[in-house]
């Protein structure tokens, strides 16, 4: 088994697509259904051909409520400072660069999408493997 994608509802598909395009995601496919539901499949360049994020616009499902059960998605970047500058230049408002594990740990920043979903941007320190491993918790 492996994780395929993260999917969540959005209130305005065009607004969300514009936001995620600025972050670096690209459209892989789109499916439209009766009743006005649209599913937009996205990924980042390093994801190759695989969809990693699905935005679901379902106007018939009632008001969008994130609630307190969803925390965030995390996106790995090569250079967090450059990424933050690029996002700001595109009109987005990323959070400050943080060092949650001290100067030898990852650099992180939080970003909110138009619906309030949180995205954690992570730059690993030199020599760290891509992704989170058991060693990160020891």
In which residue ranges do the predicted regions lie?
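N-terminal beta-strand motif that seeds the catalytic metal site of vicinal oxygen chelate
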Residues: 1-17, 70-73, 122-138
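Generic beta-structure capping elements
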Residues: 45, 55-58, 124
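Vicinal oxygen chelate
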Residues: 2-12, 30, 40-41, 45, 62-138, ...
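Short glycine/serine/proline-enriched coil/turn segments at secondary-structure junctions
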Residues: 34-36, 63-65, 103
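Active-site/binding-pocket entry motifs
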Residues: 48, 61-62, 127
């Amino acid at each position: 088994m492996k994780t395929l994608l993260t999917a969540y509802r959005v209130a305005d598909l065009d607004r969300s697509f514009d936001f995620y395009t600025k972050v670096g995601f690209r459209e892989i496919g789109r499916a439209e259904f009766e009743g006005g539901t649209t599913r937009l499949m996205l990924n980042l360049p390093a994801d190759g051909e695989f969809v990693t994020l699905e935005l679901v616009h379902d106007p018939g499902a009632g008001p969008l409520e994130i609630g307190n059960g969803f925390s965030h998605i995390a996106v790995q970047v090569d250079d967090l400072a450059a990424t933050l500058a690029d996002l700001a230049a595109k009109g987005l408002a990323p959070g400050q660069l943080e060092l949650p594990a001290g100067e030898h740990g990852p650099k992180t920043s939080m970003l909110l999408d138009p619906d309030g979903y949180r995205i954690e941007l992570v730059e690993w320190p030199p020599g760290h493997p891509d992704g989170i491993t058991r060693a990160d918790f020891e």
